[in-house]
């Protein structure tokens, strides 16, 4: 009951005309900080773990820090098609991010705007990885899946969009 009320309030906060620019500016600043954090954390773990690829540092029973290059898409799908995969996924990811950049301009509610922003920031960070390294660096290892902060941003943004469109549209 309380969760439904919170979701209802979040879905109905408008990007009002009076403070629209301010809300968008704060979201952009926050999103830029998330992008920088993701890139810095990846850079740290790339340099820290580069001498021991394949070795995972156990933090908790099902939580490890691993050194994994993902040349494909989620869960390593198409990982073995490196030659054409990186360029293909770089182009596809860029097109998707640009489409979402268009959608964010149409956002009427703050939740919708911020959800799109998370997906854009996550996608952009993974595009930067592909441009710099030819693959996406994943390091957060939770039981059976390995991902990075950018993937988490995309996941959370997508969940927020599902919530938004489930309750509002």
Curated annotation (Swiss-Prot):
It catalyses: Release of signal peptides from bacterial membrane prolipoproteins. Hydrolyzes -Xaa-Yaa-Zaa-|-(S,diacylglyceryl)Cys-, in which Xaa is hydrophobic (preferably Leu), and Yaa (Ala or Ser) and Zaa (Gly or Ala) have small, neutral side chains. One of its GO terms (molecular function) is aspartic-type endopeptidase activity. GO terms for cellular component: plasma membrane. Pathway: Protein modification; lipoprotein biosynthesis (signal peptide cleavage). InterPro entries: Peptidase_A8. It is found in: Cell inner membrane. The chain crosses the membrane at residues 26-46, 55-75, 84-104, 117-137, 142-162. It is an enzyme of class 3 (hydrolase). Its main location: membrane. It is a multi-pass membrane protein. GO terms for biological process: proteolysis. The active site is at residues 138, 151. Its EC number is 3.4.23.36. Keywords: Aspartyl protease, Cell inner membrane, Cell membrane, Hydrolase, Membrane, Protease, Transmembrane, Transmembrane helix. Belongs to the peptidase A8 family. PANTHER family: LIPOPROTEIN SIGNAL PEPTIDASE (PTHR33695:SF1). This protein specifically catalyzes the removal of signal peptides from prolipoproteins. This is Lipoprotein signal peptidase. It comes from Orientia tsutsugamushi (strain Boryong).
